[in-house]
């Protein structure tokens, strides 16, 4: 708490589709976050171990992750600072779109991956957030991650391009 009695903002790192690669600038992009949420297609324990050097990590399965990994969940549901968050890879709805995901999940923030396309969409106090793919460059898209800031019971997302 600050001197004014207001709660300090909570900042969560959001990453997806690493496919076995943690780029060097992920450490800078996610520095200072209290937790990292990984939306699947992790690509192995080495990725989770390296991300855990930045902050505690929770991750879900993607369509390319081996089933049965005890460090990966089907989905994650949590509440931080009064904001409910759902994390899944997105492939469970076929081709994930913000409309499909916001209809399927009731959370304030729905985090997904799979498409490799960074996206922040929503309305009515709800967000669909895809941080983009942080791993190997595919589909001529710039790799990226996101930071989710929660303050006053509201969430705001920022996409961060990865250059290295």
Residue ranges and their predicted role:
Residues 58, 91-158:
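Conserved beta-sheet core of the metallophosphoesterase superfamily
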